[in-house]
Amino acid sequence: MSFKGTTVIAIRRGGKTVVAADGQVTFGYTVLKSNAIKIRKLFNGKILAGFAGSTSDAITLFEKFEEKVKAREDGIIDIKRAAVELAKDWRSDKILHKLEAMMLVADSENILLISGTGDVVEPEEDVISIGSGGNYAYSAALAYMENKKLSAADIAFKSLKVAARVCIYTNSNIVLEEIS
């Protein structure tokens, strides 16, 4: 899947987890909005999520993901299990299967990419990125991760700035959320 119009990155470092995204929304070759919010805190601020793709589809997926997190009877938050359950539904449900979006979800211990093809990916490094500028931001973040003085927030911000310089569908209006 390839989506134009956004870049989202998730990073863990030093006990902090960050999800950040640019604010650009495009329709074809036209910029419609420069300050969209593509990330949100879920489950009372314990989980961060970001999306690339259709906004209405992403809202549906946020809601479905939150339902999967809440479904656990013992009250323990398990985003890995919730992500797998969402991916199974997303792939097999006739309506969900048509949704065009990708999600990054993260808590204080995990970062996961969830796709409509049924993939749930936990990155080897403590960084992952999606969207049209995702590869640029990911590459920059890997390089910035070598600098032990930079925080997760610094790396996310700098990486999105790099993506904004080379990806025409990514801008430098960055929104960042952080949890410990």
Swiss-Prot record:
<dbReference type="InterPro" id="IPR022281">
    <property type="entry name" value="ATP-dep_Prtase_HsIV_su"/>
</dbReference>
<feature type="binding site">
    <location>
        <position position="170"/>
    </location>
    <ligand>
        <name>Na(+)</name>
    </ligand>
</feature>
<keyword id="KW-0963">Cytoplasm</keyword>
<keyword id="KW-0378">Hydrolase</keyword>
<protein>
    <recommendedName>
        <fullName>ATP-dependent protease subunit HslV</fullName>
        <ecNumber>3.4.25.2</ecNumber>
    </recommendedName>
</protein>
<dbReference type="GO" id="GO:0005839">
    <property type="term" value="C:proteasome core complex"/>
</dbReference>
<keyword id="KW-0915">Sodium</keyword>
<dbReference type="GO" id="GO:0009376">
    <property type="term" value="C:HslUV protease complex"/>
</dbReference>
<feature type="binding site">
    <location>
        <position position="167"/>
    </location>
    <ligand>
        <name>Na(+)</name>
    </ligand>
</feature>
<comment type="subunit">
    <text>A double ring-shaped homohexamer of HslV is capped on each side by a ring-shaped HslU homohexamer. The assembly of the HslU/HslV complex is dependent on binding of ATP.</text>
</comment>
<dbReference type="GO" id="GO:0051603">
    <property type="term" value="P:proteolysis involved in protein catabolic process"/>
</dbReference>
<dbReference type="GO" id="GO:0004298">
    <property type="term" value="F:threonine-type endopeptidase activity"/>
</dbReference>
<dbReference type="GO" id="GO:0046872">
    <property type="term" value="F:metal ion binding"/>
</dbReference>
<keyword id="KW-0645">Protease</keyword>
<keyword id="KW-0021">Allosteric enzyme</keyword>
<dbReference type="InterPro" id="IPR001353">
    <property type="entry name" value="Proteasome_sua/b"/>
</dbReference>
<dbReference type="InterPro" id="IPR023333">
    <property type="entry name" value="Proteasome_suB-type"/>
</dbReference>
<feature type="binding site">
    <location>
        <position position="164"/>
    </location>
    <ligand>
        <name>Na(+)</name>
    </ligand>
</feature>
<dbReference type="Pfam" id="PF00227">
    <property type="entry name" value="Proteasome"/>
</dbReference>
<comment type="similarity">
    <text>Belongs to the peptidase T1B family. HslV subfamily.</text>
</comment>
<comment type="function">
    <text>Protease subunit of a proteasome-like degradation complex believed to be a general protein degrading machinery.</text>
</comment>
<dbReference type="InterPro" id="IPR029055">
    <property type="entry name" value="Ntn_hydrolases_N"/>
</dbReference>
<keyword id="KW-0479">Metal-binding</keyword>
<keyword id="KW-0888">Threonine protease</keyword>
<feature type="active site">
    <location>
        <position position="6"/>
    </location>
</feature>
